[in-house]
């Protein structure tokens, strides 16, 4: 007869800091941990060996850890009511921000579409896409709600006019590493005076032009996946996986901006702020376009005057919840980026309905 295996505090043989197996580890069906979840339980083999986790209070107050740099935090669904921006009854589109997305090289209309639609679905008031001319027809059909402005070559004055128009800027998705893309990124980073999200090829260009790091501001958000992060910080993906918190916090100390380091467990941080560890989302989201959706969501939240650090944490959490909603419908194999877009509306519809009901009670 198989026994039910219960671990106390953390399964023997697991690192409480990293989740690594230290030789041989106990595989539990349940783990009863004391006071607070250990950070290592969220990573590595620990996710498989902890089993169902129960946190038992032993009288330790969270305030004991105030000010400690090695303490992280997470969100759960109940936090949404305090995180989502209010929607005023008498609002117009101008209240929710003008987004400029500099995205999509020739043939990469999909990246532009996913970013722009995600910004709209997350609540942005108006989205303008600045993209290669070859993408214009596709985007006008895919997303008629967006303003489509195009380029055939780099035009500095035109770009500066668009940057002046916008309340928030997102750049990088599907942008390529072309000379035109490099000029677009360089001018944006040097000239933008608004919150700015930099993703994908924007990060790859940034990693090769270290002088641009000096131009990053506290209003910028960088959203690298692990390979892009390796290019930015100079450590291999293997090193980042093995000592993610050390190298993540080391990188945060080099920039004034927010960093969203994307992985199965995404980290969000800013120098001097606690690190957020995301626990929403699932393996079905490992598909092309999912990162473009996240970039658009974060930009859409910035447009609603959410501060960059909070826009990063909330955007990542909502993105994961949208992926969880998509997985329930499509399973672990068949989820596409477009399904994650549908999941955004599902998550926010459920939450807004609850908010309306609370207001009426």
Residue map of PLM features:
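Internal gly/pro-rich beta-alpha loop/helix module
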Residues: 1-70
